Structure formats: structure tokens, C-alpha cells
Swiss-Prot record:
It is a lipid-anchor. The active site is at residue 83. Changing residue 169 to A: Reduces catalytic activity about 5-fold with respect to nitrocefin. Reduces thermal stability. Carboxylated on the epsilon-amino group of a lysine, with the resulting carbamate functional group serving as a general base. Probably N-carboxylated at Lys-86 at neutral pH in vivo and undergoes complete N-decarboxylation, at pH 4.1, in vitro. N-carboxylation at Lys-86 probably increases catalytic activity under physiological conditions. The modification N6-carboxylysine is found at residue 86. This is Beta-lactamase OXA-58. It comes from Acinetobacter baumannii.
Amino acid sequence: MKLLKILSLVCLSISIGACAEHSMSRAKTSTIPQVNNSIIDQNVQALFNEISADAVFVTYDGQNIKKYGTHLDRAKTAYIPASTFKIANALIGLENHKATSTEIFKWDGKPRFFKAWDKDFTLGEAMQASTVPVYQELARRIGPSLMQSELQRIGYGNMQIGTEVDQFWLKGPLTITPIQEVKFVYDLAQGQLPFKPEVQQQVKEMLYVERRGENRLYAKSGWGMAVDPQVGWYVGFVEKADGQVVAFALNMQMKAGDDIALRKQLSLDVLDKLGVFHYL
């Protein structure tokens, strides 16, 4: 009888010890990602602290929305899309046969806002150079009625185009939030927008920026100069080697004279710190 009691006490002691060790192990493993995430957040925040601008950087991996920056409320605030609307414009135009991906849009010989725009472009080339007149011509071909119905069909932003079919994304009334932007480009990356698969693939290829290892970056910039305060965008997604897609949207207040390359550079720096698109 005494032997049974001794054995019972030994087993109980071992069981308690094992449970305590398991609890300590769980506590240790659960704190590691929290520390890492905290360090990552601090490193990203340091990037935004270096710039004197209201800004937010939003990421979306198909499940989670994350926000970084100096003014996180901008993530849910609507702004004109500026040239990031070229993505939707191209999708609508190609889907409705208003242009092809190989068509040459001829320059009319008149000086444009940037001298680099004074030449012929395909839609893809105009996407890369952000050539506004080419996409204004595409919008005029689409026309106000079709443009309005298409924006409603795909649920783009506030779906308002007003009376000027070649100005509404530059001056308003069309607006979109950074969260809406990341979800839109995420669906494009996955081929899940309500457009033909081949159309989505064509537009996706127009957005290609660079490759690092097996990871690929696709993006479009935007600068709304016709509104006050001015707004800057850098919107896109990274396709990682394992097939994961991470969409992102930088939205920031800008002013005349700001560095035109800041939006892209800041986005690349943030993506690097987040471990999404590392510098090699």
C-alpha cells in the first residue's frame, strides 16, 4: 500500500514537472514572433519618421490588412487615384475591345507636359511612363456611359466619374481608399477580377518593375497634382517564390517640388524591412 502511494506521488511530480516545462516552452515560443514583429514595426516606422509627410503604407496578403506610417487614418480615407487608375482604365479598355495591347497610340506632334511623352506609345509603354494623354484617349474611346457602368460592375472606389470622361481620376470626383487599392491589385495578381484572364494577364505584365531572385515586383505610381493637398501613390504587389502574393499601397501627402522618386524608394525600403521584397 505504501509502495503504491510512493509511486503515485512520483508520477504526480513527473506530470506536474512536464506540464510546467510545456507551459514554459509555449510561453517562450509565443514571445519570439511578438519581439520580431515589434522590431520590424520599429524599423518600418523609422523610415516614415525620416520624411516630413503624412503617409500610410498598407499591405494585404489575401487575409490580413496591415498599416504602417505616420497617419494610419489615411488607409480608410478616399483620395483621387491619379495615375493608379491606369490599371482599371487598361482593363476596361482591353476587355471592351477599345484598344489592343500591341496598338500604337500616335503622338499628335503637340508638346506634352513631359518631353518624354512626346512620342508614340503602346498601352504598356504608356503605363510604364505614366503617359496621361494616351490613357485620356483610351477613356474617351470607352466613353462616359460604358466607363460608368464598368466602374459600378467592378466596384472601383466611389464609382463616380462626373461629366469629364478624361479627367475624373485626375481631378475627381472618382476617389478610392488605400485599402480598396490593395484589394483591387491583389485580385488582379490572383486573376480574380471580373475581366477575361488574358486581359488581366496583359495588364499585369504592363505593371512589371523588377525581379529579385525569384520574387517579382509589379507596381504603378500616381501623383494627384490637380487637388489640394496633392496626393502621391505607389500601388502594386509582390509575387514571392513560394507563390504568395502581398499587395501594397503607399499613400502620402505631396507638394510641388517633392522628389518624384520618393514614393517608389520609400515603398521599396518598407518592403525590404517587412521581408517581402529584400534588397540583394
